[in-house]
Amino acid sequence: MTTYDDVDYDPEVVNIRPAATVMLVDDRPDLQVFMMERNAATVFAGGMWVFPGGAVEHEDHPELLGDITMGRTDADTSKLMAIPSGGIAYYVTAIREAFEEAGVLLAHAPGEDQL
């Protein structure tokens, strides 16, 4: 079992950063949820079962995205999340992290509605 007795996660000491997490759920009758086991050597949550996710990066922000958000705007996504702005960056982060960490690409071809 991994312990963190010698690690300080006090928010006054550790910088808290905006981050996004993805829950992938298969809604068949036997409900399945996709999770990953983190490498035991990882300092933060090593050996733990987690959902794919991670920190919002500068490149995830809307002014750098171009026309890849399929009509979703920062204003729309921010309103859904009840935050003043930056909502679209959380969406982009979730998609990017799902692919980087788990190889799951949450996307569809232009003109298609299915992932």
Which sequence ranges carry the predicted segments?
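N-terminal leader/linker segments that precede catalytic domains of diphosphate-processing enzymes
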Residues: 1-115
